[in-house]
């Protein structure tokens, strides 16, 4: 009788005896990319990417309050298909990887802003500068993996622009935007999987 009463009260009060956190998703790097584009001489888009990164994602569209996103990028992995330019970008003139080897984003909240559209609000750190940042992203879809029973695959896309000077990426003569524009377009394509 006591168990029946307790169960009834649980239902009436809207509480579930088991509270499940959003799933932890595992990144599939073979289907993920971290890319960026910067204009050269204000006219020519030059594309690059970071090839070493980690994404820690706990996410459920139905439980955004407990969802979180943390990203760590190894700046040493920068690749613009030009070894000399990559070395310069790693130098004190730009990222100064000897002292600041990672770019990090840590969410403090995730909000829905439309159908399958979300914004992760948190802090972005580049070099030794940390600023509040809103990272928009789209849930492209979720499907069951036909080759792995019980495994769900999800895909996300994020496109945004940052001003490199907000993070002091450009010292001395490289503060000017004649050669390398201040505006950097970033595109993230992320595929993850989890056992749901």
Identify what each model region corresponds to.
Residues 15-196:
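Low-complexity, acidic/polar, glycine-enriched regions of mature
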Residues 3-13:
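Sec-dependent N-terminal signal peptides
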């Amino acid at each position: 009788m006591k168990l029946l009463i307790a169960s009834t009260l649980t239902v009436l009060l809207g509480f579930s005896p088991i509270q499940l956190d959003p799933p932890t998703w595992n990144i599939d790097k073979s289907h993920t990319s971290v890319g960026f584009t910067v204009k050269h001489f204000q006219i020519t888009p030059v594309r690059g990417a970071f090839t070493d990164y980690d994404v820690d994602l706990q996410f459920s569209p139905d439980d955004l309050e407990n969802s979180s996103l943390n990203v760590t990028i190894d700046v040493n992995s920068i690749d613009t298909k030009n070894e000399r330019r990559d070395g310069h970008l790693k130098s004190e003139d730009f990222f100064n990887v000897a002292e600041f080897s990672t770019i990090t984003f840590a969410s403090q909240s995730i909000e829905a802003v439309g159908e399958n559209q979300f914004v992760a609000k948190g802090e972005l750190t580049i070099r030794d500068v940390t600023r509040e940042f809103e990272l928009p992203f789209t849930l492209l879809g979720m499907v069951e993996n036909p080759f792995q029973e019980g495994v769900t695959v999800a895909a996300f896309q994020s496109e945004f622009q940052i001003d490199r000077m907000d993070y002091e990426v450009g010292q001395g003569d490289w503060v000017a935007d004649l050669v390398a524009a201040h505006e950097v377009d970033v595109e993230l394509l992320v595929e993850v999987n989890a056992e749901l």
